[in-house]
From Swiss-Prot:
Gene3D superfamilies: 3.40.1350.10. It comes from Caldicellulosiruptor saccharolyticus (strain ATCC 43494 / DSM 8903 / Tp8T 6331). InterPro entries: Restrct_endonuc-II-like, tRNA_endonuc-like_dom_sf, UPF0102_YraN-like. This is UPF0102 protein Csac_2148. It comes from the Bacteria.
Amino acid sequence: MNKRELGNSGEEKAVEFLKKMGYEILHRNFRCKLGEVDIIAKEGNTIVFVEVKTRRSLKFGYPSEAITMTKQRHLKRVAEYFVQRQKAKNCMYRFDVVEVYMNVKNEVLDINLIKNAF
């Protein structure tokens, strides 16, 4: 399984997890001229922009550590674009991170949700 397949599998598991946590999934892999966000969901009245990071080991650190300041800025721009496009300027929104840990058999070992990650 290559990195893209691992990432896609992790996103599938993250969507299942978020649904169980009561999130309503609005979009997956939302793309615009400013960038891309893995999942856009809604929890209550809050729009949640979710970045999913999937790992097989901690060899390169925790998954959330891979979300650099540059990536955070890109995600914030995409979020602002999305909110403006939806004409929901006064809505509340936040950024969550879902860390998915999988083994070589593509089985989930653990899923960690970080609300208000940045």
